[in-house]
Amino acid sequence: MLAPKKQKFRKAHKGRVASTAKAGTTLAFGSFGLKSIDGWRVTARQIEAGRKAATRCMKRQGRLWIRIFPDVPVSQKPAEVRMGKGKGSPEFFAVRVSPGRIMFEIEGVEENVALRALELASAKLPVRTRIVRRYE
């Protein structure tokens, strides 16, 4: 799974997702991409599940790029623990995805295979998405 090698701080604020993405809104590598419509927090496990679903559909043909990286530590308190007594320990990493952000890109497979792979990947993500093409 994706995780940063080093962090400046162990714990992060919950934060909010910014209005719309300022960067990463156009296709940079592939011919087809998966663009977010909503703003939400996507975990490293969800990114990995989307990657596995897409590559399995592509049958290891072509190339897949992941354009987002989980760099925000998310902390949780253990189950059945009362409120207070400090913040919980970091459990996993996530990325705050803004609306309009390209998350996955595909190149080197037929159009119907690429569209199916991106549909399967989008089913694993908590955000609403749309598929974009290079010539749009």
Curated annotation (Swiss-Prot):
PANTHER family, alphabetized: 50S/60S RIBOSOMAL PROTEIN L16, LARGE RIBOSOMAL SUBUNIT PROTEIN UL16M
Name by which UniProt lists this protein: Large ribosomal subunit protein uL16
Pfam families: Ribosomal_L16
Function field: Binds 23S rRNA and is also seen to make contacts with the A and possibly P site tRNAs.
Subunit structure: Part of the 50S ribosomal subunit.
GO cellular component: cytosolic large ribosomal subunit
HAMAP family (alphabetical): Ribosomal_uL16
GO biological process: translation
A Gene Ontology molecular function term of the record: tRNA binding
Alphabetically ordered keywords of this record: Ribonucleoprotein, Ribosomal protein, RNA-binding, rRNA-binding, tRNA-binding
Domain of life: Bacteria
Matches recorded under InterPro entries: Ribosomal_uL16, Ribosomal_uL16_bact-type, Ribosomal_uL16_CS, Ribosomal_uL16_dom, Ribosomal_uL16_sf
Keyword check for Ligase: no
The family this protein is said to belong to: Belongs to the universal ribosomal protein uL16 family.
